[in-house]
């Protein structure tokens, strides 16, 4: 989820490095049509310290998804899911999906469609 003027508290260089680490981890999972949990993703980010339930992680994922979608690669963060329970992305993903023009009237359908789009792009 993106927030205007959000202060993440890191230098821009460190933030960008963390974003790239997260992006690469998600791409690796998408290439094999896989997914990654929020807690496993934050372990892959070493340039900055984030926790799985950190609002800064939400913003980082929002930036990545917006950039990837603008590049016609879909919302890459669709591969990041809860470890337990519904095994789907959190509510911030769907809020951003709506702002990017996705139909979220059926969350499961929205998620599956976006997951297929991202997997198809990266696995080819």
Spans of model-derived segments:
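Long, low-complexity, charged/polar intrinsically disordered regions in eukaryotic proteins
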Residues: 1-5
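Nucleic acid-binding interface residues in structured DNA/RNA-binding domains
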Residues: 6-23, 28-124
